[in-house]
Each structure stands twice: as C-alpha cells, then as structure tokens.
Amino acid sequence: MLGLDACELGAQLLELLRLALCARVLLTDKEGGQLPPEEALDEAVPEYRAPGKKSLLEIQQLDPDDESLVKYKRALLGPVLPAVDPSLPNVQVTRLTLISEQAPGPIVMDLTGELAALKNQVFVLKEGVDYKVKITFKVNKEIVSGLKCLHHTYRHGLRVDKAVYMVGSYGPSAQEYEFVTPVEEAPRGALVRGAYVVTSFFTDDDRTAHLSWEWGLYVCQDWER
C-alpha cells in the first residue's frame, strides 16, 4: 500500500502536472467564443479560456515528441495500466479505520459491502483518547482532483460537529491509497457520552459523490459499552 507521505507527494506532483498541461493548452488554444461566467479564471483577463478537462489517456498522449515532458509524465503517472472493468467507479472507498494507541486494536469499517447495514453497527470510542482516522481508497481510471472526506455528526437529530479532511489529488493505480488524518482528541465528560449518528461523504472538486454512508458512534468511559 501507499502511505501518507507518498500520497501527499503524489498529490502535489499531480497538481503541478495539471497546471503545466493546462498552461500548454491555454497557449495553443486559439478558438473564439463566449465562455460561461463560472469558467472564467479572472474577469480582469478577458482573453483567458479555461482549458477543457482531459482524460488520463489524452494526457499520456499529449506532446509525444517532448522528451522531457514524456519522462516527467512517466515518472509521475507510471506505466499505462491494463484496462479495468468499465463498470467500476473511478474512485472506490474500501475502508475507514479508527487508529488509537490506547485502543485494544484498530477499529475497521468495511465500505465494500452493504452500506445500509452500517446504520445498525455502533463503533465505540473511549472518551478523551487521541485517535486518527485512516481512509483507504482506489482510483481506477482517471486522475481525480481535490478529494475530500466529510463527517457530519448528529445527536438527538441536531448536528453537533462537522469535520472536513482534504485528501488531495491522485492518479489511477493498481494499489490502494491511504490517507491518515491528523491526531484528534475524543471529547470527554458526562455531557458528551452517549450515542451519535455520523453521515460521511467522499467527494471531490467536481462535487462528484463517490460514496456516502451513515453509521453509529458511541462515546463512553471505556472501549466497550
């Protein structure tokens, strides 16, 4: 698997590649026409034309005679992957894992099965402990930009917390990616103990809903209710 450091580096390189390719397209695209307002980069630069989104194959085939760019793309994107099942989604979120050095072991949420069943599962979190969340996912077909994971936490029907984790940008890979959140401290005290409902979303800059699911969380004095 790919660890967090590799993912962060890959995300930064992917963004650089996208910017370089967008600049190249911008310089070579001479067609006229009026763009929708949301596609304008800056009203102060009326000549700007937002480049169209390119597929991974188009990026790999772009400027084959530019040796430096070809080497850069090969180092960044790796070899061309074998064809994948077209029915597979571009992004697959496979697991969410709660990690704490104070826990008996990792708490793993399998996201490949029936998501509705997670509503009936309750994951226990001991109050006051330090913990991290690891998100495991795959990218199958195209580069995806600005992945993020959101958690909305509810108690008695009212939202009491919203967490947003910026996961980054990734290219297709035969291996799973892992993203680990910064360390957080679980709430503590009699007022926060009890049951919560969490609605989680995995989305991107294009607002594509790659996955959404609901699960139960219970904060108590120990790792067992």
Curated annotation (Swiss-Prot):
Functional summary from the UniProt entry: Inhibits GDP/GTP exchange reaction of RhoB. Interacts specifically with the GDP- and GTP-bound forms of post-translationally processed Rhob and Rhog proteins, both of which show a growth-regulated expression in mammalian cells. Stimulates the release of the GDP-bound but not the GTP-bound RhoB protein. Also inhibits the GDP/GTP exchange of RhoB but shows less ability to inhibit the dissociation of prebound GTP.
Name of this chain's protein: Rho GDP-dissociation inhibitor 3
GO terms under cellular component: cytosol; membrane
Subcellular location: Cytoplasm
GO-annotated molecular function: GTPase activator activity; Rho GDP-dissociation inhibitor activity
Family assignment from sequence similarity: Belongs to the Rho GDI family.
Gene that produces this protein: ARHGDIG
One Pfam entry name: Rho_GDI
Keyword Cytoplasm appears in the UniProt entry: yes
